[in-house]
Amino acid sequence: MTTSAPPSPGPRQLHLFISGLVQGVSFRANAQRMAHTLQLTGWVRNLPDGRVELLAQGEEKNLKSLLAWAHHGPAQSRVDHVETHWVEHHAPVEGFHIQ
């Protein structure tokens, strides 16, 4: 690594609402595994309307990988739509949890 390289962008936050067949198909457990693999923090939970809500924090490239995964999810799921919100500033979250 050279000292003249620009600094890497800081942590960002990604907030997703995923709709389709995403509950009862291990979506949250697989999202947690993917987040751990990508060294992201945050949480994932089922919503009463049948969607899954996911909040992740970390490096942008890793968040983009999680977003790409969220568009198809685990094999048993069917993702119809992913509502995506990027946030620059956030309060840090420890670990990645299923709520």
Report residues per predicted region.
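Intrinsically disordered, low-complexity, mixed-charge
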Residues: 1-99
